[in-house]
Amino acid sequence: MPKTRRRPRRSQRKRPPTPWPTSQGLDRVFFSDTQSTCLETVYRATGAPSLGDYVRPVYIVTPYWPPVQSIRSPGTPSMDALSAQLYSSLSLDSPPSPPREPLRPSRSLPRRPPIQPPTFHPPSSRPCANTPPSETDTWNPPLGSTSQPCLFQTPASGPKTCTPSGEAPLSACTSTSFPPPSPGPSCPT
């Protein structure tokens, strides 16, 4: 086991003397002034406090106010009466005041149904539950357009109609029964 060096303890007598009288614990100093109506209690630490029992210095001022003469005009209720009246009106035993009637909507405006949150259904294999699945999906061209939809036959399903997309065509419509129209819309593969 290696030898441990003992550090020499610093003597606590080498510190400079404190300007106030030192004693064990705390000094309680009372300042009482006849001119002022405040009683000041000051706690201050004396000496160098150790880390174990360090008490922060506390400064406490407790003001003392002289009694004030009643300066209210005759006929006005006192603060005690007002506070008692307020306490009785706000007590829990008294019934709550009836709520005011809400503003009635005018008869000219139609009454709206209350807003309900949307309901979410689990995803199903069919796109819509109300519409029956059809083999041929039809596409109605917008007004002013004379292009015809291109129909093509796939071996898995019947004839389908391609909806035009605004993107560049990936491939031209290929069909075994109809020639591909040149100005027609493109079909995604």
From Swiss-Prot:
Phosphorylated. The keyword RNA-binding applies. A motif (Nuclear export signal) lies at residues 82-93. GO terms for cellular component: host cell cytoplasm; host cell nucleolus. Induction: Down-regulated by P30II. The modification Phosphoserine is found at residues 70, 177. A motif (Nuclear localization signal, and RNA-binding (RxRE)) lies at residues 2-18. Residues 56-70, 123-131 are annotated as: Homomultimerization. Residues 1-16 have a biased composition (Basic residues). Belongs to the deltaretrovirus Rex protein family. Homomultimer. Multimeric assembly is essential for activity and involves XPO1. Binds to human XPO1 and KPNB1. Interacts (via N-terminal nuclear localization signal) with human NPM1. This is Protein Rex.
